[in-house]
Amino acid sequence: MAYELEAIRTSQEIFYFLLEHHELREEEEAQLYKAYTEQEEVQNLVKSQGEIAGSNIDRYGNVIYLIPKEDNDFLGFSKAQLKSVLCKSGATDKDYYLSQFVILTLLVEFYDGQGSSSKAREYIRVGELQNCISSRLKEGADRQTEAEAADEEEKKPGAKTQEGIAFTDMMQAYEALRSDDKGSRAKTTKEGFLHAILVFLEKQGLIEYVEQDEMVKTTKKLDNFMDWNLLNQNHYKRVMRILGVTEDE
């Protein structure tokens, strides 16, 4: 298909804006937003450039987002980069997967996947979140131990939970972190580890971390992602199975 030069130029302008800002809001860039939403050829060109750059271009509400795919280390974050930002010095894979589990737990506490909006609460206290993490890790580790014991009786050693989550490894990594009730920001403490994750999520525009009140709120950006893209019922039920949450809990 042959595209008009003006459409190509406009699509490049939109894509460059997305590369720089990762989002394009109607109220801030009305002309570019209108071109994307009302001109099919412009939208197709922008999406094509996104595909070449290993990203998806999606619109939720009145905002257009550039979302790097999971394996996009250039526009997104590599495992090594995340480990460096979120975990203590010399962190292992156990520490990295623990950080991802913390984020998953945070999402589940905010979103229940029910109704017209998946959001279930407006905020969570940091202390409550820390208790949730400890509780879910312990429950998961207990289930894994029971499953491994049952499989040992059947001569099937080395089994993990059904979803393949190594809860005992993450539990060990979490227990290796010191507790500090003085508000330490060191990543070698449970409080500092959680603080680093919350600061990272805030920098990505996904949460509002009110440190003086020890409170976490979600942003409209995260709400949109969860409602429109990430948290359909299939994804939600799988996440709840991983965390070991039953229907009547």
Regions flagged by a language model, labelled:
Residues 1-115:
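Eukaryotic partner-binding/assembly regions in large regulatory complexes
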Residues 26-32, 119-133, 142-146, 151-184:
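Short acidic, hydrophobic short linear motifs in intrinsically disordered regions
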Residues 38-46, 186-203:
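Short amphipathic alpha-helical interaction segments
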Residues 50-59, 198-213:
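A short, conserved structural fragment
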Residues 63-67, 214-220:
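Minor-groove-contacting beta-hairpin "wing" of winged helix-turn-helix DNA-binding domains
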Residues 78-82, 169-186, 203, 222-249:
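Short, amphipathic alpha-helical interaction segments positioned at domain boundaries
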Residues 208, 217-225:
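Low-complexity intrinsically disordered segments
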